[in-house]
């Protein structure tokens, strides 16, 4: 497992992919898979089964992981 310079709550800029150039905050860091989840970037529509929190089910917009090499830390 590698130690990363990017932590939860850091401001990062996406440097590759559809959201290239966006600056946003890191929601979650996943060191085992070398990925991060960035707020508002790589949003996908996921289907959700009915549950107590969402009785009807349906579709939810959810941020998907981005490889850590595709983001760079930005000084706030």
From Swiss-Prot:
The keyword Ribosomal protein applies. It comes from the Bacteria. GO terms for cellular component: ribonucleoprotein complex; ribosome. Keywords: Ribonucleoprotein, Ribosomal protein, RNA-binding, rRNA-binding. The keyword S-adenosyl-L-methionine does not apply. One of its GO terms (molecular function) is rRNA binding. InterPro entries: KOW, Rib_uL2_dom2, Ribosomal_uL24, Ribosomal_uL24_CS, Ribosomal_uL24_KOW, Translation_prot_SH3-like_sf. GO terms for biological process: translation. Signal peptide: none annotated. CDD domains: KOW_RPL26 (cd06089). Belongs to the universal ribosomal protein uL24 family. Part of the 50S ribosomal subunit. One of two assembly initiator proteins, it binds directly to the 5'-end of the 23S rRNA, where it nucleates assembly of the 50S subunit. This is Large ribosomal subunit protein uL24. It comes from Wolinella succinogenes (strain ATCC 29543 / DSM 1740 / CCUG 13145 / JCM 31913 / LMG 7466 / NCTC 11488 / FDC 602W). The gene is rplX.
């Amino acid at each position: 497992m590698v130690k990363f310079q990017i932590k939860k709550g850091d401001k990062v800029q996406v440097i590759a992919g559809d959201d290239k150039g966006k600056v946003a905050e890191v929601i979650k860091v996943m060191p085992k898979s070398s990925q991060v989840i960035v707020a508002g970037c790589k949003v996908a529509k996921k289907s959700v089964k009915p549950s107590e929190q969402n009785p009807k089910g349906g579709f939810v917009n959810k941020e998907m992981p981005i490889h850590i090499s595709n983001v760079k830390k930005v000084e706030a």
